[in-house]
Amino acid sequence: MKIAILVIALGLAGCVAQGPVVNQSDVGKIVNCSSKFYNPNVKCYKEAPKQTVEQMQANFDEAIRPDESAQAYRNSDVITREEKIENYCAELWANWANNYQWRTGKNAPMEYVVNSYNSCVKNLT
């Protein structure tokens, strides 16, 4: 199930990506990943964000706060925290993979993306 979510997210994100989609003001802080909101003044990192488990948990908790303008699935009370974690990690790594492809012209290394997704889920649960 977890891998299926990641594969679907990668496929959907690949269809709509028009440019860099992983925008970060600094390593450890994830900002809006929609290319529609891409800000050319914000550095897009070519490498995956290096974060401690504590930073990952803080970023996840911030992303699912009900008063934030996050995507609906993040704020829904219908799905479990585990499902929110899976969705969050799938979106994070799908966006990273799209950014990698946009910058290099090559497909992201899937084994790395899947392992990173699994690590993200493990660190947040």
From Swiss-Prot:
It comes from the Viruses. Pfam families: DUF5481. InterPro entries: DUF5481 (IPR035146). This is Uncharacterized 14.1 kDa protein in imm-Gp43 intergenic region. It comes from Enterobacteria phage T4 (Bacteriophage T4).
